Amino acid sequence: MNPLRRKRLLIILAILAGVGIAVGLAMSALRENINLFYTPTQIANGEAPLDTRIRAGGMVEQGSLKRSGDSLDVTFVVTDFNKAVTITYRGILPDLFREGQGIVALGKLNADAVVVADEVLAKHDEKYMPPEVTKALKDSGQSRLARIRSLPRRAK
């Protein structure tokens, strides 16, 4: 084989190997950082994987928030108006976290079907709802507008 051809072939093989390694590393990083969103119904039906980082979201049920007296542990229930799932969190909740509001919790589902969250995200204004939560509520036949319309009206 001609020395010039051999040199070109080695350069091409080195470039291909480098591109292959770069693609492999990128795919590995993406696989580790993907947190799939699951609704409370999907979690209750067993569709969410155990011990894998997921995002769970919905509306915080009224009266479900329980704070520990001696630590930062918090337990609350999130619903999509079909099913509900319990979420535990250790830390300070966001200032905008309230019962009856939409949230997304990032954490792992344990064998007791409880999401152990390490991060809780709350909506940041009155009109905003996380896209995943909005879609889940629409899929369940519930929406904020439908809930508002169902509230009793005040007499004038």
Curated annotation (Swiss-Prot):
Binding site for heme: 124, 128
Biological processes annotated in GO: cytochrome complex assembly
Superkingdom classification of source: Bacteria
Keywords from the UniProt entry: Cell inner membrane, Cell membrane, Cytochrome c-type biogenesis, Heme, Iron, Membrane, Metal-binding, Signal-anchor, Transmembrane, Transmembrane helix
GO molecular function: heme binding; metal ion binding
GO cellular component, as recorded: plasma membrane
Family label: Belongs to the CcmE/CycJ family.
Protein name: Cytochrome c-type biogenesis protein CcmE
